[in-house]
Amino acid sequence: MHFTMEELCASETAKKKGINNKPNAQQMINLVYLCAYVLEPLRLAMKEPIKIGSGFRCEALNKAVGGVSNSQHMKGQAVDLCIDGDMKKGKKWFDYIRKNLPFDQLILEHNSKGSYWVHVSYVYPDFGKNRRQVIENLLKK
């Protein structure tokens, strides 16, 4: 595997604020499934590194970054993938996931500072159903 638990839980905000952003056993299991069914297949297909911008968030970290109260990041079911301002790469990853991989929610997102990322979540079938919800709010051109 190309992904580590450390990178899936890394957070500059958690470091700065002294937040212990450690997942429990169930959250770790969810992260492993997310890697196995979405992140690793994406990495192998794209043949390029996939950088995690935001992965697991404990409740305190989720509040600190302004995450929604029902964020799948808190369950270990979601990550935001960095595309480093490369919308072509972001669109390629987004389209590949949508057409080829299981997912619960897939969003091409941005913030007011001009940062862009791909949000993807996955729910292992034993724990719920994947909705295959797609939100592409950036590339309406």
Regions found by a protein language model. Name each.
Residues A45-K47, M74-A78:
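Short connector loops at helix/strand junctions that flank enzyme active sites
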Residues Y37-M46, K92, Y96-N100:
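Generic non-transmembrane alpha-helical segments
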Residues M1-R43, V134-K141:
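Extracytoplasmic cell-surface/polysaccharide-interacting catalytic and binding patches
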Residues L39-V65:
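Extended, low-complexity, intrinsically disordered C-terminal regulatory tails
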